[in-house]
């Protein structure tokens, strides 16, 4: 699917003496509702998974094909989340870090190095390297991006059964025209991020 060597970054760090490297990615920073989620994945060194790349470049069908393959072959993986209430309390950046920490804490073994997608980092209790667009160039981050995207999408589909009036199964909580129309008609639900809706309600 891509000519990119998805193990180039990891191999650079393996050569520097790191032995256990995990990739970390998040999903759900931007939506108006639901949690922000993170995944941490440790794949066997240089494992080739055909089609592995940034989850955003894949169809939902392809992500769901890769989801069990990643879980089956991973040495370890963890999923963490921070709720909409925590997002409102501590802000989305800190909540994202909290979800990442919880994902790392779920790993059955401690990595020597965590590769984090993006350009912001905090103290996770393990050495960290940020990788801009890491989900497109790092196998471990790409695997994490797929696990976390499918996991969060499924959570929002489940929430759609509880709050059917918002269309969560379609937009997954993002601020689409239909979502804002539902907010206008029905008001906010228990899983909406009120800090994200201040501007919207300020215009009412």
What is each residue range found by the language model?
Residues 1-204:
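RNase H-like, Mg2+-dependent phosphodiesterase core
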């Amino acid at each position: 699917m891509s000519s990119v060597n998805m193990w180039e970054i990891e191999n650079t760090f393996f050569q520097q003496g790191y032995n256990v490297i995990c990739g970390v990615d998040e999903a759900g920073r931007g939506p108006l509702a639901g949690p922000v989620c993170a995944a941490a994945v440790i794949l066997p060194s240089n494992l080739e998974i055909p089609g592995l790349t940034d989850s955003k470049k894949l169809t939902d069908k392809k992500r769901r094909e890769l989801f069990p393959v990643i879980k089956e072959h991973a040495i370890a993986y963890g999923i963490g989340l921070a709720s909409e209430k925590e997002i409102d309390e501590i802000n989305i950046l800190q909540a994202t870090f909290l979800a990442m920490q919880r994902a790392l804490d779920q790993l059955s073994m401690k990595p020597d190095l965590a590769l984090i997608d993006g350009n912001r980092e905090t103290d996770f209790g393990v050495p960290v390297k940020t990788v801009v667009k890491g989900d497109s160039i790092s196998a471990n981050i790409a695997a994490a991006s797929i696990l976390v995207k499918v996991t969060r999408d499924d959570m929002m589909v489940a929430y759609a059964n509880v709050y059917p009036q918002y269309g969560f199964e379609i937009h997954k909580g993002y601020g689409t025209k239909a979502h804002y129309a539902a907010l206008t008609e029905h008001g906010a639900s228990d899983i909406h991020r009120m800090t994200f809706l201040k501007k919207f309600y300020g215009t009412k």
